[in-house]
Amino acid sequence: QKIESEEADVIKYLFTYYNPTNGLKVECTVKGYPSYQAAEWVLNFTNKGTSNSPTLEQVKVVDLAMQYASKGEFKLHYADGNHISKYDFHPRSVTLATGETKQMSPQGGRSSEGDYLPFFNIESPAGQGVILGVGWSGTWYADVCAQDNRTISMASGMKTMKLYLRPQETIRTPSISLMFWENIDRMAGHNKFRRFVLAHKSRKINGKFAEYPLSSGFNYRDPAPCTEYSCLTADYAIAM
């Protein structure tokens, strides 16, 4: 079902699946961004029945394989998450070994804590690629595997999900965004993704990008030997 979109240059569809036996309803809301060759979707599960739903677990919001015309190596470009160190958000690149799954997930229940940020770039041997983003503030996972020298697979969703829904209860999954790019330089894909985020994922007020305050704190006891009590002065706090 095509539905009206409130956003400019965005098309929107709603796909609905319903099981009359147990009353489980699944809705997939899809957004398309034609100017950026991007698609985004999220799943919603609703129990329309009169008793608890069957168990929902291991839901893969994306479970996809793509085959390219050229043979060769696939490269994964991603960034470190937050370790409270000078290496936070450091860019990383790995060549995917055929048949070995690269598993990515954050730590501590936070979407960007640990070794990975929730978006990454897959570069194919064909001078094409896809950037995948996971929209989730909790613990997500993403598995990427070079099935052979032409095929790449990816799966992603909520890492820990085993639950049931009470009658009339609803839950949503992480959202998934795929943006496709084509260029011999994979940085063209990164820059296209930045433009996509600015155009469609950045808050604007009266047509202008929102300006947020710079802020800092001492909750991680640094720089050593400082803590929030031993070094902080009024002037220092104002400067921070």
Feature names for model-found ranges:
Residues 1-144, 159:
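Polysaccharide-binding surfaces and accessory modules of carbohydrate-active proteins
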Residues 57-61, 163, 181-189:
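OB-fold single-stranded nucleic acid-binding module
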Residues 129, 170, 213-215:
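A residue-level signal for beta-strand positions that form part of recognition/binding surfaces
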Residues 132-140, 145, 177-207:
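Acidic/glycine-rich phosphate/pyrophosphate-binding loops and surrounding catalytic core
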Residues 134, 156, 175, 180, ...:
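Pocket-edge structural micro-motifs
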Residues 146-166:
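Short acidic, Pro/Gly- and aromatic-enriched capping/linker segments at domain boundaries
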Residues 163-182:
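Short Pro-Gly-centered flexible turn/kink motifs
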Residues 186-240:
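An acidic-aromatic substrate-binding cleft motif
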